[in-house]
């Protein structure tokens, strides 16, 4: 008889946890919640200290500080108790630092010697560092890459001047080394790391870095701009050209990394979709470092010459909206996220948001009598909401060489599938029993089940007939639903295209009948368009989803009561029956079958241009899905990151003279990096047959590599090629 399997040592771990407590082993499986995950990381750090010959139980270590930071906003009782326990330890125990002999749990980073700046240049900087050394030491206990937590409403970390000493740094990522002019403060990393865990799970850490260029804003003022193109919609039948809206244009810019192409290269995505079955969004963090600020002056000579100078006193303003106070404005919907090429500099998008307005546009067509009704009413005083970053979000001032870290945000989202379903209602449950089977090879027209249709057993919802067929038998629910494709609704602010869940269904050649709702993306050279393309016309693609929504409008019909066979013209409504006698307008164009029995898959991730996560609506009845992103944050979402070159004034500035400030032309280049962590489930093969996977052919292989002048493009990739059963 085989000996019993050894059970992992649990130690003094309270119920509901696997690692929160002393004496447990490190092989208990996946943590149960964020506090338990912090405890596991803490235990791993303690194990590393013990292996190096140090006793962390007698000292307060950086691992203890990281646990305090990660449980600062813990909602569970265990996390709260652990948080205050280590705060008490911090008050009484001597400090143990991370050195080469005292390891931490972050990725190992070898300290590098850097040249010490000339003392005659930085003597004032050294005095300032000495005065603030205590605070700097506390800041360095929780660098970004060591897992600092971004709490709801908490303060991000600004590490602008750290202890220099001999120039040796500690900690992973951008947390080590000395700050200041001429000294690097971070690393440039665009690797995707796959860590294979137990039970078929994979931890995917996507690192991304970009050089970001930011000009000073055209104006330091907030502006309310009314866009009014009533000349276009004054023409009959042109309602869809309506662009009327009001927006607040701000002097800030938005650093938005919420697109798949920011994080994964085409090879990464191929590996993920070919080997994984689902993705879980875990955490997100980002950092700004190596800030450079320069002024631009122009000579009076002809032709004029521009001179660029470093400005060590100019400031870069940074604000993290961790409480989501500002309007949520994901940039992927406008293709204005950070660029997808790590080696190319990118720009943040100017930040703006919608402002309330009312208007009336009555639909028309070319045969409508009279002039189209198109009235702009303006803003309702009851609905005015004017937001400014300066009085709503803490703003941090960075100078040359400074850095800023957001800490870690943990997501609360449902997983995203990387497989598609093909089963519709006609493929659910037990097929009918066949009285006889084919006797010859290749027979494809086996026409009769063998039992007369009005004598079969089973369940239907047909009230006055005994026929049981594949068309009439009762199924458990409705897979997908019929929805109108080109349907525009109207609000008090104008018409809008009704969003629908995209999916396969209907003839691709006739979109008016197909009602697929596949998203169509338009983008420029930063986001996949061929890099040598000239002109303003963007490149486009339509993402044709593999999911079968269950709808096929060409085959719909409505049967009259009472049921009759065969049906006559008076007993049935077909897709070919027009509405109002208009050619091509059929009842299926307005037919919606969504209801409580509807089964529907989530939207697919669209690589590279699609949005990754979205913010949940602040409504009492919330949508089950969002069509623009597969991950919907259940409570909070990562705070938006805003940047702005601070006003660099001249001596001619007079606040009473003009609305425009007299400013020195200033711009900033800074390095941005982020880390986005997923957990994925390896896809198991349960079928005999091999399946189609994401691949390329000879014709499109060279889209992914540059030509002799550097021209290249990014071609979108499918994300749900592998099939799965849904019932």
From Swiss-Prot:
Residues 25-35 have a biased composition (Polar residues). A motif (Nuclear localization signal) lies at residues 4-13. The keyword Cell division does not apply. Residues 19-64 are annotated as: Phospholipase A2-like. One of its GO terms (cellular component) is host cell. Its main location: virion. InterPro entries: Capsid/spike_ssDNA_virus, Parvovirus_coat, Phospholipase_A2-like, VP1/VP2. Residues 1-10 have a biased composition (Basic residues). Residues 166-183 have a biased composition (Gly residues). Keywords: Capsid protein, Clathrin-mediated endocytosis of virus by host, Cytoplasmic inwards viral transport, Disulfide bond, Host nucleus, Host-virus interaction, Magnesium, Metal-binding, Microtubular inwards viral transport, T=1 icosahedral capsid protein, Viral attachment to host cell, Viral penetration into host cytoplasm, Viral penetration into host nucleus, Viral penetration via permeabilization of host membrane, Virion, Virus endocytosis by host, Virus entry into host cell. One of its GO terms (molecular function) is structural molecule activity. Mg(2+) binds at residue 323. The keyword Signal does not apply. It holds the Pfam family Phospholip_A2_4. It is found in: Virion; Host nucleus. Transmembrane segments: none annotated. Disulfide bonds join 633-637. One of its GO terms (biological process) is clathrin-dependent endocytosis of virus by host cell. Interacts with host TFRC. Capsid protein self-assembles to form an icosahedral capsid with a T=1 symmetry, about 22 nm in diameter, and consisting of 60 copies of two size variants of the capsid proteins, VP1 and VP2, which differ by the presence of an N-terminal extension in the minor protein VP1. The capsid encapsulates the genomic ssDNA. Capsid proteins are responsible for the attachment to host cell receptors. This attachment induces virion internalization predominantly through clathrin-dependent endocytosis. The capsids of autonomous parvoviruses expose a proportion of VP2 N-terminus and part of that sequence can be cleaved of to form VP3. The N-terminus of VP1 is sequestered within the mature capsid. It contains a phospholipase A2-like region and nuclear localization signals that might be exposed by capsid modifications during virus entry. Belongs to the parvoviridae capsid protein family. This is Capsid protein VP1. It comes from Feline panleukopenia virus (strain 193).
């Amino acid at each position: 008889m085989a000996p019993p399997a050894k059970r992992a040592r649990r130690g003094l771990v309270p119920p509901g946890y696997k690692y929160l407590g002393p004496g447990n082993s490190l092989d208990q499986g996946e943590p149960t919640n964020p506090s338990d995950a912090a405890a596991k990381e803490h235990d791993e750090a303690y194990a590393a200290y013990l292996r190096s010959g140090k006793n962390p139980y007698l000292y307060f270590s950086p691992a203890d500080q990281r646990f305090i930071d990660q449980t600062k906003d813990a909602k569970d009782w265990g996390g709260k108790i652990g948080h205050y326990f280590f705060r008490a330890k911090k008050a009484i125990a001597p400090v143990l630092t991370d050195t080469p002999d005292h390891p931490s749990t972050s990725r190992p980073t070898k300290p590098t010697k850097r040249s010490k700046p000339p003392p005659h240049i930085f003597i004032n900087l050294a005095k300032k560092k000495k005065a603030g050394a205590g605070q700097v030491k506390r800041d360095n206990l929780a660098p970004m890459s060591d897992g600092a937590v971004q709490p709801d409403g908490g303060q991000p970390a600004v590490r602008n001047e750290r202890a220099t000493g001999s120039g040796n740094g500690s900690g992973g990522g951008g947390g080590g080394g000395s700050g200041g002019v001429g000294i690097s403060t971070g690393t440039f990393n665009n690797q995707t790391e796959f860590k294979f865990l137990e039970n078929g799970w994979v931890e995917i850490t996507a690192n991304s870095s970009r050089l970001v260029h930011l000009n000073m804003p055209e104006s330091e003022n907030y502006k309310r701009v009314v866009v009014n193109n009533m000349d276009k919609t004054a023409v009959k039948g042109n309602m869809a050209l309506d662009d009327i809206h009001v927006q607040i244009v701000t002097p800030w810019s938005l650093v938005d990394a919420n697109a798949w192409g920011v994080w994964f290269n085409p090879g990464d995505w191929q590996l993920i979709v070919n080997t994984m079955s689902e993705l879980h969004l875990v955490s997100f963090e980002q950092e700004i470092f190596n800030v450079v600020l320069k002024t631009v002056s122009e000579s009076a000579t002809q032709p004029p010459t521009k001179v660029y100078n470093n400005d060590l006193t100019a400031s870069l303003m940074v604000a993290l909206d961790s409480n989501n106070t500002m309007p949520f404005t994901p940039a992927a919907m406008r293709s204005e996220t950070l660029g997808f090429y790590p080696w190319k500099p990118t720009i943040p998008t100017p930040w703006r948001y919608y402002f309330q307005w009312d208007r009336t546009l009555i639909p028309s067509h070319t045969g409508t009598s009279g002039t189209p009704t198109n009235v702009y009413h303006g803003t309702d005083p009851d609905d005015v909401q004017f937001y400014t970053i300066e009085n709503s979000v803490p703003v941090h001032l960075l100078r040359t060489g400074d850095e800023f870290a957001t800490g870690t945000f943990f997501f609360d989202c449902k997983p995203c599938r990387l497989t598609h379903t093909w089963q519709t209602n006609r493929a659910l449950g037990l097929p009918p029993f066949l009285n006889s089977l084919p006797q010859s090879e290749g027979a494809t027209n086996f026409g009769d089940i063998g039992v007369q249709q009005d004598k079969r057993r089973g369940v239907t919802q047909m009230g006055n007939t005994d026929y049981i067929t594949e068309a009439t038998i009762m199924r458990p629910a409705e897979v997908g639903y019929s929805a109108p494709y080109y349907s525009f609704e109207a609000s008090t602010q104008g018409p809008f295209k009704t969003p629908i869940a995209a999916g396969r269904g209907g003839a691709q050649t006739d979109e008016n009948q197909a009602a697929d709702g596949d998203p169509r993306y338009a983008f420029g050279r930063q986001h996949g368009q061929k890099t040598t393309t000239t002109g303003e016309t963007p490149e486009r693609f339509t993402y044709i989803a593999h999911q079968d929504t269950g709808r096929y409008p060409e085959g719909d019909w409505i049967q009259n009561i009472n049921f009759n066979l065969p049906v006559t013209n008076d007993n049935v409504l077909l897709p070919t029956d027009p509405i109002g006698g208009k050619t091509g307008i059929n009842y299926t164009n307005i037919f919606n079958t969504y209801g409580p029995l509807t089964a529907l898959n989530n939207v697919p991730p669209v690589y590279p241009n699609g949005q990754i996560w979205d913010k949940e609506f602040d409504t009492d009845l919330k949508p089950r899905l969002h069509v623009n992103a597969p991950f919907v944050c259940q409570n909070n979402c990562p705070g938006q990151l805003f940047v702005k070159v601070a006003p660099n004034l001249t001596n001619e500035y007079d606040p009473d003279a003009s609305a425009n400030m007299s400013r020195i032309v200033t711009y900033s280049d800074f390095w941005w990096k982020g880390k986005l962590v997923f957990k994925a489930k390896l896809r198991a093969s349960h079928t005999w047959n091999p399946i189609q996977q994401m691949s390329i052919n000879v014709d499109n292989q060279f889209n992914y590599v540059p030509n002799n002048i550097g021209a290249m493009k990014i071609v979108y990739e499918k994300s749900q090629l592998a099939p799965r059963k849904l019932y």
